[in-house]
């Protein structure tokens, strides 16, 4: 499964559909075709079926996340204005919220030390620029610099 890759593609700002365990291959192919999506998979049979259906496909070659991301980033470009604009859990675009509106929804230390916040209207999860954010930006920069060499 490519759940970690899907999460990171969302962090990079890509509109990323990740099927749950109940979604079968026929449904995945239908969604990919209907929504004009790039199909990423390690499943050779699904890749073959995607090619036969004339979908854009990319067979992921490894289980290593950084290598997976590097492979994907050789095929699609990051729009840096979209980085960290989607919920990592459900893919919904995040909404910027005013600091005063979230006081009871984030830890007190976060409220005291951070000024910018975002909200997922589907998951009801809050995001802010903390150490996770800084680590993600560092990883994005590392991967994009490596791919631009």
Residue ranges, per PLM feature:
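Long, charged N-terminal interaction/targeting segments
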Residues: 1-82
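Short hydrophobic-aromatic micro-motifs
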Residues: 40-41, 119-120, 127-128
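Short metal-coordination and nucleic-acid-contact micro-motifs, chiefly zinc-binding Cys/His arrays
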Residues: 80-83, 113-116
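Surface-exposed, charge/polar-rich loops and edge strands
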Residues: 83, 121, 145, 149
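Short cysteine-rich clusters marking metal-coordination/redox-active sites
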Residues: 87-90, 120-123
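Short functional micro-motifs and their immediate structural scaffolds
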Residues: 92-98, 128
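Short cysteine/histidine-rich metal-coordination sites, predominantly Zn2+-binding motifs
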Residues: 101-112, 135-146
């Amino acid at each position: 499964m490519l759940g970690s890759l899907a999460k990171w593609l969302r962090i990079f700002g890509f509109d990323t559909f990740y099927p749950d365990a109940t979604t079968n291959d026929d449904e995945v192919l239908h969604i990919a075709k209907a929504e004009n999506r790039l199909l990423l998979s390690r499943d050779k049979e699904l890749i073959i079926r995607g090619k036969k259906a004339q979908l854009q496909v990319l067979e992921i070659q490894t289980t290593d996340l950084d290598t997976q991301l590097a492979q994907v980033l050789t095929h699609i470009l990051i729009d840096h204005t979209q980085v960290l604009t989607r919920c990592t859990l459900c893919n919904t675009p995040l909404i910027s919220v005013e600091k005063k509106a979230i006081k009871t929804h984030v830890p007190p230390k976060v409220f005291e030390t951070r000024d910018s916040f975002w909200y997922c209207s589907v998951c009801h999860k809050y995001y802010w620029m903390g150490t996770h954010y800084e680590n993600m930006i560092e990883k994005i920069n590392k991967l994009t610099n490596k791919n631009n060499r």
